[in-house]
UniProtKB/Swiss-Prot annotation:
Localization terms from the record: Cytoplasm
Residues given in the record as GTP binding sites: 16-22, 44-46, 307, 333-335, 415-417
Enzymatic class: ligase
Protein name per Swiss-Prot or TrEMBL: Adenylosuccinate synthetase
Source organism of this protein record: Mycoplasma capricolum subsp. capricolum (strain California kid / ATCC 27343 / NCTC 10154)
Residues binding Mg(2+): D17, G44
Cofactor, free-text remark: Binds 1 Mg(2+) ion per subunit.
Substrates-to-products reaction catalysed: IMP + L-aspartate + GTP = N(6)-(1,2-dicarboxyethyl)-AMP + GDP + phosphate + 2 H(+)
Role description: Plays an important role in the de novo pathway of purine nucleotide biosynthesis. Catalyzes the first committed step in the biosynthesis of AMP from IMP.
GO biological process: 'de novo' AMP biosynthetic process; IMP metabolic process
Subunit structure: Homodimer.
Record-listed IMP binding positions: D17, E18, G19, K20, N42, A43, G44, H45, T132, R146, Q226, T241, K305
UniProt keyword terms in alphabetical order: Cytoplasm, GTP-binding, Ligase, Magnesium, Metal-binding, Nucleotide-binding, Purine biosynthesis
Length: 432
C-alpha cells in the first residue's frame, strides 16, 4: 500500500461501531503516528490479527505497530484508572505501550464524573439516553464550565488544593441533588497519584508534536471515536455523545490547524446499527435483525449490550458525508450480508406526506420518518476469502456501485471479515 498523504482522518459515518479501529490499524501499518482527537474510554475499537482479538478504548489503534507513535489528543477526556488498566492489559498480551503519549491539555475523568453520569441516567427514568456511564458527559460539561482538571494540572504545586476544591464542589451535587453518599478524598487522591506516576513520562505537547510530524512529511493518522450521527452538534440530539465526532474536530482536538488535514475517510458498515435510545428509521423488527446481529457479532464491546440492526440508510449517510467532510468511504462488515436474497437501502424519508432527503433536527420528527427503500439482489455467496473488488460476486459489486451513485462519494475499499488481512483496497491512489 502506497500513500501520498501527510495527514488522513478516519471518522465513523453512522452511529459508531462501524469498524474504525480495524481500518485505523490497517492504515497505521504505513503511519508514523496515530492520534485520537475526541471521546474517552466509551469507545471500543476492536482489532483482530494472528487469530487473536484485541480491544482498545482510549489508546489509539496504532498501538499494535511498535514503530508508530500513538498520541491521545487534547480533545479527549481521560480516566487515568482506565488508561493504566488498558496499558497493563496490553502489556500482558506482550504489546508494548512505550509508544503511547498523552496530551498535557487533555481533560481528566474522575470518580465523581462516573458517579454523576450514573445518577443522571437513573434520574432520566424512561427518557434514558443510553450512556455508557463512564463519566464522559460530566467531564466535558466541567470542561465547558471551566471546572475541569487537565493532565498538566497534575504537576501543579497546589494540585492537592485544586483537587479537594473540585471534589467538594461535586460532593455537594452528589449529596444534595442526588441524595447519595459523598466520595472519599483520600482514596481517590492516592489512587490518582499512583496512576500519574505510571504515565507522567509519556505526557507531551500534542499540537507541537503533531504539527512537527506533518511539517517533516511524516504520515499522521487521526482516529475518530463514535460516529458523525452521534456528534454533539450535528448528531441526532439529545441521543448523542458529548464531543464532536466529525473531521472538523481533528484539528481542534489535537492542536493543529485545519489546513493541515488533507483527506477524510468515512467508515460505513454495510448495514446500520445503533446502541441505546434514539430514532433509527430503517430499524429491522423481524427475526432478520437477530440473524444479522449474530453474524456481525453486534454487541457493545464495552457494555455487551445488543445493538439495534437496520438496513443501510443512505439519507443518514449523505448527511454524515456533508457534515463530516468525508472524501471517500470504506465499507465494513460486508460479509454479514452474504446470506441475504434481497437487500434494502433507504434512499429517502417520508415525513407528513412529504419526501425529504436529510435528517430533521427535531428528534420527534426524526422518529416519525418512514424509510423509502430501494431493493437490490443479494449474492448469497461467501465473500470472506476474496482479495479484490473484481473477485466479488456481481451483485456485491453492484451494491457498492449503487451506494456510490446515490451518495456521490467513491469507496476506497471494503472489509470482508474481522482479520487485518480481510481488508481490501479498490484500485486507486493507495495502490502499490
Amino acid at each position: 500500500m502506497k500513500n501520498n498523504y501527510k495527514s488522513l482522518v478516519i471518522v465513523g459515518s453512522q452511529w459508531g461501531d462501524e469498524g474504525k479501529g480495524k481500518i485505523t490499524d490497517y492504515f497505521s501499518q504505513k503511519a508514523d503516528a496515530v492520534v485520537r482527537f475526541a471521546g474517552g474510554d466509551n469507545a471500543g475499537h476492536m482489532i483482530e490479527f494472528n487469530n487473536k482479538r484485541h480491544k482498545v478504548t482510549i489508546i489509539p489503534s496504532g498501538v499494535f505497530n511498535p514503530k508508530v507513535k500513538n498520541i491521545i489528543g487534547n480533545g479527549t477526556v481521560i480516566n487515568l484508572k482506565s488508561l493504566v488498566n488498558e496499558i497493563k492489559r496490553l502489556n500482558e498480551s506482550n504489546i508494548s505501550t512505550d509508544n503511547v503519549y498523552i496530551s498535557d491539555r487533555a481533560h481528566l475523568i474522575f470518580d465523581w464524573h462516573t458517579l454523576i453520569d450514573q445518577l443522571q441516567e437513573e434520574n432520566r427514568k424512561e427518557n434514558k439516553i443510553g450512556t455508557t456511564k463512564r463519566g464522559i458527559g460530566p467531564s466535558y460539561a466541567d470542561k465547558a464550565a471551566r471546572y475541569g482538571i487537565r493532565i498538566c494540572d497534575l504537576k501543579s504545586p497546589n494540585f492537592k488544593e485544586i483537587f479537594k476544591e473540585n471534589l467538594d464542589y461535586h460532593n455537594e451535587i452528589i449529596t444534595k441533588v442526588y441524595n447519595h453518599k459523598p466520595l472519599d478524598f483520600d482514596q481517590i487522591y492516592n489512587e490518582l497519584l499512583t496512576n500519574y506516576q505510571l504515565i507522567k513520562n509519556n505526557i507531551i505537547d500534542c499540537g507541537y508534536e503533531v504539527s512537527n510530524l506533518i511539517n517533516e512529511n511524516k504520515f499522521v493518522l487521526f482516529e475518530g471515536a463514535q460516529g458523525v450521527l452521534l456528534d454533539i452538534d450535528h448528531g441526532t440530539y439529545p441521543f448523542v455523545t458529548s464531543s464532536n465526532c466529525s473531521a472538523n474536530n481533528a484539528s481542534i482536538g489535537t492542536g493543529i490547524h485545519a489546513k493541515q488535514i488533507q483527506k477524510v475517510i468515512g467508515i460505513v458498515k454495510a448495514y446500520n446499527t445503533r446502541v441505546g435510545s434514539g430514532a433509527m428509521p430503517t430499524e429491522i423488527k423481524t427475526e432478520l435483525a437477530n440473524k444479522l446481529r449474530e453474524r456481525g457479532r453486534e454487541y457493545g464491546s464495552n457494555t455487551g449490550k445488543p445493538r439495534r440492526i437496520g438496513w443501510l440508510d443512505l439519507v443518514a449517510l449523505k448527511y454524515a458525508i456533508r457534515v463530516g467532510g468525508i472524501d471517500q468511504l470504506f465499507l465494513t462488515l460486508f460479509d454479514v450480508l452474504d446470506t441475504e436474497e434481497k437487500i434494502k437501502i433507504c434512499t429517502a424519508y417520508k415525513l407528513d406526506n412529504q419526501i425529504i432527503h436529510s435528517i430533521p433536527a427535531n428528534e420527534n420528527d426524526f422518529k416519525r420518518c418512514e424509510p423509502i427503500y430501494e431493493e437490490l439482489d443479494g449474492w448469497n455467496e461467501d465473500i470472506t476469502k476474496i482479495t479484490s473488488f473484481e473477485q466479488l460476486p456481481i451483485n456485491a459489486q453492484n451494491y457498492i456501485k449503487r451506494i456510490q451513485e446515490i451518495v456521490n462519494v467513491p469507496f476506497l475499499g471494503f472489509s470482508v471479515g474481522p482479520d487485518r488481512k480481510q481488508t481490501i483496497l479498490i484500485k486507486g491512489e493507495f495502490d502499490d
